[in-house]
Amino acid sequence: MNKNIFITLLISSLLLLSGCTGDTCIDPDDFGFIKFNVSSRYNPEEITSRQEGDQVAPWRDSAYKVNGYPLTVMVRPWSYILGDKNTSGQLSAWCPWYGQKNNTTTLAAFCVKLQPCTFWDNARLDMCTPNPANQNDAMISNPPCIMTDGVGLYFLIAAKNTDPNISPDSQRKPQGITQHLGELTSSVGYEFYSISSTGQFLPAGGINYQYKGEDKSKYAQSPLYFKIIDKFYDDNSGQYRLVIKSGVTDTRPDPLQFLTDLIKGVLFGKDGIIKKTYQQIIDTPGYRMSVSAILTLYIMFTGFSFLIGNINLTHVELIVRILKVSIVSILLSTDKAWTFFHDYLFVFFIDGVQQILQIINEAAATGPGSQSLLGLLISPQTLSKLFSLLFVDWLGFIYIILYLIALYFIFFLIFKATIIYLTALITIGMIIIMGPIFICFMLFNITRSLFENWLRQLISYALQPIILFAGIAFISMIIRTEIYSTLGFGVCKHDFPNLGPINEIFGSFLEDIDPSLGNSIFYWWFPVPMKGGINNFHKAKILVPEDHIIVDDSCKNDPDKCKHCAAYECIDERYIELPFLDLVKDAKRISNFINGKFVQLDGILLIFVSIYLLSKFNDTAISTAQFIAGTSGNLTDIQKVNQQSYESAAKQMNRPLSYVAKTVSVPVTTRVSAKLEETSMFFAKGFEDIMMGRLEKQALGSSANKAVQNEVKRKYGIDSKDVKMNAITDYENGISGLLKNLPKGNELKAKELSQMKFTQLRDKIAANKYGVKDYAALSEEQKRELDKSLKDANLRELASDANFTKDYQDAYKYAHQEMSGRGVGLFGKNIKPLRSWQEMEHRVDTKRKLKEERRVGIGEKLYAGYTGIKRGALTAIVGKDLRDAYEGNLTSAEWHDFEYNDPRLRTYSEKLKDDEKAREREELQMHINKETLAAQADILSPEYLARLEKAGRQSDVEYYQELAQRKLIHEVRGRLFEEGEPVMMGDRFMREKATDSQMRDMIDNAHRKHAEFIEGDRYTRRQEHYDIMHEKAEGNLEQTYKELKDHFKRDDINIEEMPALIAQKIKDTEQGPEVDAKITEELNNFNADVKNYEYSTEVLNKIEDRKQAITDEVNAQIDQINKYRENAKMEKYVRPIVNEGRKLRKLEDHLRGMK
């Protein structure tokens, strides 16, 4: 069921995403274009006026930078006559004749119905160009009119390191490339076409600018600006809607790229972990001393070998040795070490890899849309076209399902590739951290292989992402081509039902929010044209929207001479409705579209084949990189030189070198390992915090796992139905309301206070309101006043509910982790048969493990007993002192001597006994789990025991209480003996070694741990909840009893007759037709109070029994310590702990006491 819900939510989210395009219609080549609006109006403070009618306005920054490819910008068409609306979401025209301040995105009413401007001889070239010498006005033949198709709009590719808005002169004559977007594209041999809001293909304005000569590299990564140029802006109205189809670097966020940049910043940023750790290593005095020693030895051995003639020191060899000494010497310069090695070595493995991957990704982006394949597949435009197939072809549903399946696999394959890349990135960082150690190893032959292996690993992990993403890019190109060919048609929204007159009232407002909400909140996408037929398709010369190769007669025999065209670089004749399909090569697909067959199943088949290839390539990329790096030869031999053998000198060299290598590696490697562990813990802790936070939210949400909830109910006794999911928020809101009435309430934060218990909260509020230390320091009058404020705010009950909800969240997390620890994975938590099988496997493995441990323990116990007999006999013969002197050779002393690595300093035989108790605890827990599973409830919880006792199952209560007592003893002892500050050390240590102060500290520690155990026990923590329930029920019953007593003038009323007396009292005091309803309501309230009183009384008594059991066990350990003190002739220290609990009376006894 949960799986079906997940699939439903996934499809629903994709459907929702498909409606987030913000457009009424989507062009055939739109798979996620960058859209930008340019207004014809400016704020008065932005405009500079030199003289009347000569205003200069700033250029609008698009926030994008050009990338050197053809810059293609289209201006949306707009026609009021054809049905387009004068709204911010549809308007793409401006009027230079009339406008007001509020006409930044709409036309003035005067201009709406004006005709588009026409020009004498279509001369638009010299119209208001950004040139001070040009004073010409546009040669308009039909004023007044509106400007459309980009007339008057210019783009600016600003020169690098320049700001076109720094001064009025730079605004008028900026440095860079400026072009007018309103020129007739037909003059250059092509046309722009776009689908209007009414679903018609209309000619559009725009420009396709292709760089000349060196401009491509000169202006790469330069900012792009736009501006409507006019001489007087104050009377303008309207805007242009632009679509940037190509030529800019897409800076829109990609989730996986964001994750990569985040981790890279943490590791390799300016203050990254890698740099800090690297500098800490080279700053270590011991490391610097070791490097100095290595250099000294290397120079000494080089001189010695040259003097005795063992090496032929040629010019090349001398240069090589000097370079080695120079490189290693840099490690001694802490200021320059990181800068040198990062800028000349490590940068190739960090930024170099990133640049290569960027080049690969750009090469793989063969058309419009996101550079990321995943971004293309889930873009709103792509999904809108995909879901439009549902009602135009009976195969549409099948295609959509197959597409979603393919999307699922592609997501996980790309995610896997990203994880491989991040792993390689982190590993490169770790290898770089170890660089100061391994760079020193390049000096000597005996350690050179270590340096070579270090460098090979660095190269291997740098190659892995390159090879991996090169393969992904290749497969991505195939998938992109199929997506473009299959879904490269236009779509429009069709509303149902149309709101008609209502739209006239609310349509403009809704369109200002989202242009897609103009007519109805219900809609669906349909292809344009929706029907087949050759008359619905039109040919024209257009810019080809994807990378392709032009094959003509000049290159048929030599394919290398064929021209490669980038997207929107070359012109071809194609159907404007199917711009990605070549008229010759794709004739079959074009025929299918014309005949109304929009679904191309052969395309989805090719996508699945590509996914299979991608999965295989992911598995081989790492081994390929390792193969290349492992067979690249000796990477450190700059040039081979002749060396004579000097075996005798080499043998003498190896001794000090081995010592020096060990001296360098041990302390530094230890520090590096610590830093690496710290780094890994940083990511592990962050991931764990995210997962725990997710589980906490899941526990209180509708997506909570039913299997985990049942586990919580069985093992922790908390039913999710009893949990108030908004209790934490209600508690925080209640505190906020109380703080508003405090004179210094603004000094406290409600969120921090909501994490406290009620008593701690009361102390804080007392200190804030009255300036005292805590609640106990208040006078009686102040206490009554504060208690009334807290009671009016109902904070005690809210705090109890919030703590109960937090306990449930913790139990949910623990149950989820416990199920995972037992081998119950994600599918097991949702599929009951699989979960049962996994649980059974875990129980079998646990029993097998315990059986094996018991068998080993029995053997060790027998041997320990045998050695104990020998030890006792030796003591009787030679005495204790002589035994201790010779015990190691006679009686296996390791069984009876202290384990100094043990925090409790036990002997091995004592540890065996404790291990046996630990096995008993595990066996007991398995038995309790079995009983819990059978009862489908937490058999140890006070609530369950109270219900059993109420049902008269006293034998079961006694049995479960005996199990609870045994488990509680194990838990208390485990808490007392845990590492850190154990309450009890080993028996031999306590008898022979423990001092007076040590034993006093142990007893003090026992008192502290007793309080912590009571405070943290999951059963005793519920006392406040049932205290409130008991007090409410008790108060209501006392009030009812008093009213009956006063009404009937009786002192001998018992509980059994109270319902009849309540009914009689209402009949005596009330009249009218509502008497019966009143009687029913009062009796229901009385019965509920009786039930709550009796239930809470039983539960609270069980909780008190548990607290007393905890106290008794802690006292038993304190008594044992005092026995050791008595045997050592020490005085008894402090009295045992006393549990100050109370036993509540039954309801009959309580009412009897009121008479």
From Swiss-Prot:
Pfam families: TrbL. InterPro entries: Conjugal_tfr_TrbL/VirB6. Belongs to the TrbL/VirB6 family. A lipid is attached at C20 (N-palmitoyl cysteine). It is a multi-pass membrane protein; Lipid-anchor. The keyword Lipoprotein applies. It is found in: Cell membrane. Residues 1-19 form the signal peptide. A lipid is attached at C20 (S-diacylglycerol cysteine). The keyword Cell membrane applies. GO terms for cellular component: plasma membrane. Keywords: Cell membrane, Lipoprotein, Membrane, Palmitate, Signal, Transmembrane, Transmembrane helix. The chain crosses the membrane at residues 291-311, 395-415, 424-444, 459-479. GO terms for biological process: protein secretion by the type IV secretion system. It comes from the Bacteria. Disulfide bonds: none annotated. This is Uncharacterized lipoprotein RF_0093.
